[in-house]
Design a protein with these regions (language model features):
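Extended, low-complexity, polar regulatory segments
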Residues: 2-39, 82-134
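Reductase modules of NAD(P)H-dependent flavoproteins
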Residues: 10-51, 310, 435-439, 444-449, ...
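Alpha-helical transmembrane segments of multi-pass membrane proteins
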Residues: 21-38, 74-84, 150-169, 244
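Membrane-embedded alpha-helical bundles of multi-pass integral membrane proteins
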Residues: 54-61, 65, 118-343
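Transmembrane-helix exit/juxtamembrane "anchor" motif
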Residues: 70-92, 205-213, 288-293, 325-328, ...
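Non-transmembrane, juxtamembrane loop and terminal tail segments
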Residues: 89-127, 353-380, 554-581
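Ferredoxin-reductase
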Residues: 357-459, 518-519, 550
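Histidine-anchored nucleotide/phosphate-binding helix
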Residues: 414, 491-506, 529
């Protein structure tokens, strides 16, 4: 029990209690103090019992909710370390121990076949793109199932632990027919409000680039963006229901009107509540893809999103500061995320600058190549070496162009293999198509500089931040067959995988193939050195390269080969289309056929499909890979039906 000297800020929501008649105050975590014993009429006292009991239960349930989240992360993190993925070094050790050039994996155990069969069955059902694409976007069924589980879990905690009833109570100084109607709508509205507060730090976690979730689970931060978006929508619905509940109570159920409403709506906590709701609605409207594309632009949306989100959290504290135990962690997580980004950038660019012979900060100077393409967008390639640790294949960096805006950075995946040379430098190579905004501005700068340079080469400075993302070749042992499917500049995602594979020891039973769709035959020049290396080293591996030119007339049937019996074949397939015609499904490679034929020709082992390209291509890949997975066949030992998809599914606007 507390003395009666409790600060007024704690008593501002008195809940029909008369503190002047209180003998003691009972504290309730996250809520107003309660007067004990109750000095109101019996109906009001019964109602207050329900209110405070429901709130205490709600705080307990938020604890259970967060304990569930942390428990899942703990089990996941321990599982990743207790049962790590098999790595190529395991194959090397097997070779050394058996003196065999190609390691023979032991027959899968009962446990291994069980896990493989379950994983394959889950991919078969949960990998395809979810229905209602106009609502959920290009997300998988798995993400939709996770969202449904989260929503159901929150729905349960929204309703349990509340005594539902109705209490009609008299009003002092009013006629007998003027009464207050008290219902469980109030406790329920408070419950959904508390849950909205409790979800706030989780929403921040889902949005973090320096993601704690990624560090624990190994899942790239981009995969959590769908949950960040929909957690925000859940918070919006909870806030609307919370507000609607108390508007009905204060504006209709409580009497006399409009006196009760007028007195309530001018209270500071109510004003801050309306401000927070307004900001939340604005955040929701500004997140629409149409608004971002046609009104705000992505960079303005991103920066405005940060500002409005922080002001929104501040308004929540102003609305009900007793629940800031949920909000302060959200602010801390956001600040730590930003500071970690600065630290990453500093680690890459601060220190002794060997070329300049000084200590300090220095950007990276990249050699730029330019391909003019007025129809589909100009293309730029950047090449430079930077002193740093090697990243993992599949990770990406955020690049800030010093000749553009210092307040913007864009994610790009290096197409180069991350290898440290004898002086500690790692080569970076990037390709991007200038669709608009900052990339178009940089492409124009490079084009103008090339016109002025007589030697036909130019440079531009970049500032790196990263790396981010997952190691996409984790567990890619020599018995895993590899199919790479790319569209346009998506080749940067799959090229490092292939470059690594062709430098490994040969496994004659392994199947490797690249399917690449480009707009023009000229686009092959983007990665000409890398393609030449694949042709030269891939012959021994039986690498097959199939390139589809989809938007220009080229003599069909072009075929070049290198090597002898184990040769690299490169097929350039084209569909004749007139200039200016719209794209059609027939112009692109049939992804479903490519996957089916690849899996059908696998001799042994599982298959991993790497994909990067437009959303439509990724959608087709998901469907095709899901169809080829079969838990029953994997259980019987047919490993080729254990097909895993690894794709670049970063958010595009």
């Amino acid at each position: 029990m507390e003395s009666l000297t409790t600060p007024n800020s704690i008593l501002r929501r008195q809940h029909i209690q008369n503190f002047s008649e209180a003998s003691q105050l009972e504290p309730h975590w996250g809520y107003a103090y309660r007067v004990v014993p109750c000095t109101n009429d019996p109906g009001s006292c019964a109602y207050l019992d329900v209110v405070y009991d429901a709130h205490d239960a709600g705080m307990l349930y938020t604890g259970i909710f967060w304990a569930t989240v942390l428990g899942i992360l703990l089990i996941w993190g321990i599982g990743r370390r207790v049962f790590p993925a098999r790595e190529p070094v395991d194959d090397l050790l097997a070779q050394l121990s058996t003196n065999e050039s190609t390691p023979q994996r032991p027959k899968p155990s009962f446990l291994s076949r069980s896990f493989g069969a379950v994983a394959s069955s889950l991919r078969h059902h949960l990998l395809p793109t979810a229905p209602l694409r106009t609502i959920f976007g290009h997300t998988t069924r798995l993400q939709l199932v996770i969202l449904a589980v989260l929503t159901s879990y929150l729905s349960i905690w929204s309703f349990v632990g509340i005594v539902y009833g109705k209490w009609v109570t008299p009003i002092k100084g009013q006629p007998a027919d003027v009464v207050n109607t008290r219902t469980s709508l109030g406790p329920w509205a408070d419950r959904v409000g508390v849950l909205a507060y409790a979800l706030t730090p989780l929403s921040v976690l889902f949005a973090a680039r320096e993601s704690i979730l990624s560090a624990v689970t190994g899942v790239p931060y981009t995969s959590f963006m769908f949950l960040h978006k929909w957690t925000g929508y859940i918070i919006l619905v909870q806030s609307l229901l919370h507000t609607l509940g108390w508007v009905l109570i204060e504006g209709w159920l409580y009497k006399p009107q409009p006196d009760v409403w007028n007195k309530w709506v001018v209270q500071e906590y109510a004003i801050w509540g309306f401000v927070a709701l307004g900001l939340l609605v604005l955040l929701w409207i500004c997140s629409f893809q149409w608004v971002v594309k046609n009104i705000t632009g992505y960079e303005f949306f991103r920066k405005a999103h940060y500002v409005m989100a922080m002001v929104y959290i501040g308004a929540l504290i102003g609305h009900w500061e007793e629940l800031q135990c949920f909000l302060v962690p959200g602010i801390v997580l956001w600040v730590v995320d930003r500071l970690a980004r600065l630290v990453r950038m500093g680690m890459l660019h601060c220190g002794y600058q060997r070329k300049e012979g000084r200590w300090g900060f220095s950007s990276a100077e990249a050699e730029a190549k330019f391909w003019k393409d007025e129809r589909f967008g100009d293309v730029v390639r950047l090449d430079f070496e930077h002193h740093q640790k090697a990243w993992s294949i599949g990770q990406h960096f955020f690049l800030c162009f010093t000749e553009g805006s210092l307040w913007q950075s864009h994610p790009f995946t290096p197409l180069s293999l991350p290898q440290i040379n004898n002086v500690g430098d790692v080569k970076h190579s990037y390709i991007f198509r200038a669709k608009g905004g900052e990339t178009r501005k940089i492409a124009r700068v490079i084009e103008e500089k090339l016109k002025e340079q007589k030697e036909g080469r130019t440079t531009t400075n970049v500032v790196l931040q990263g790396p981010y993302g997952e190691n996409i070749v984790e567990g890619l042992t020599q018995d895993v067959n590899v199919l790479c499917v790319a569209g346009g500049t998506g080749i940067t995602y799959v090229l490092p995988v292939l470059l690594r594979l062709v430098r490994e020891k040969v496994n004659p039973d392994r199947k490797i193939e690249l399917v690449w769709a480009v707009k023009r035959k000229q686009d092959l020049e983007w990665v000409e050195p890398e393609l030449e290396e694949l042709r030269r080293l891939g012959a021994a591996h039986g690498l097959q390269i199939r390139i589809f030119v989809t938007a220009e007339d080229v003599a069909p049937g072009v075929r070049t080969t290198t090597g002898d019996e184990k040769k690299v074949s490169e097929d350039v397939d084209t569909k004749s289309v007139s200039v200016g015609s719209d794209e059609s499904q027939n112009q692109r490679p049939d992804v479903n056929v490519a996957v089916n034929e690849f899996v059908a020709n696998v001799a042994q082992g599982s298959t991993r499909v790497f994909g990067s390209g437009p959303p439509s291509m990724i959608t087709e890949l998901r469907e095709a890979v899901a169809q080829r997975n079969s838990g029953s066949k994997v259980w019987k030992g047919e490993g080729r039906f254990d097909v895993r998809l690894v794709c670049d599914d970063r958010l595009e606007w």
